[in-house]
């Protein structure tokens, strides 16, 4: 789109007192100062252009509620951004931002802030003043720590910090008591603070691709948790605390070093999906057959030699993966190749013969 065409669009939108304007996918490298004429705009989308900066005049659009600037080449934000005090949603993901101006703290009505895929190595303490923020996406940046003030964002419901360089979480992190979704995949975490127990509303917790070998006992207090992913860590045994998370429906522990499972695993009676692939499991406890709601189970790439006949009592199991267990003799390879139903039929027959 040429600058002349853009000016015509702006002039027409101003004349019509437009409230919504989409300028996505137009290879725009700049915006003219005339953008400030669109005083009635509440929604502006500039997705997927080539903007490297914003004119200060854009900050005169004081009625804006939603502003999309994702997939551009922005390396900084104008200080005047603080004037967009009615903004509720601000999308800046997939840019080149290396820092945020402290003035961003004045966007007091902001509910959703998306900053993933930038080059942020730190956050301004002032970010803590965004007290209405419920969604914050900071994944795929270069954050190695969080400011203590960060924990004052007490209304956060969803927080994404995956693909950063975090090696620890501050104890203050526990003040996010309203969090329901937390993603910390692909960091450098070797432990979690006991204060994690105070995430009393947490439903989903992603901790894959870290350096965890244990969990704090306090994690057992996350009674609302339904989804827990711990893939690609350093667990050699299943932390017993996990077995007290009775509302878990999905648990993923692939690519660890588990050699056995505790009998207490049967307490996870609501489990629907369980991924234990790529571990070193040589057997499963008899109590495993009590996971009556299990429908999807991946045990591939382990060291299993046999499955107990009682395994056939998993009446809801529809998908079972046993490939690449080189020592598995019961069920034999030719049965395993036929799939889940054949495996369960084989084990059922063995159970009947046993009984």
Which residue stretches match the model-derived regions?
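Acidic, glycine-rich calcium-binding repeat modules characteristic of RTX/beta-roll
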Residues: 307
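Hydrophobic secondary-structure block in the mid-to-C-terminal portion of proteins
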Residues: 300-301, 323
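The feature captures the LRR N-terminal capping module
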Residues: 1-47, 52, 56-71, 75-94, ...
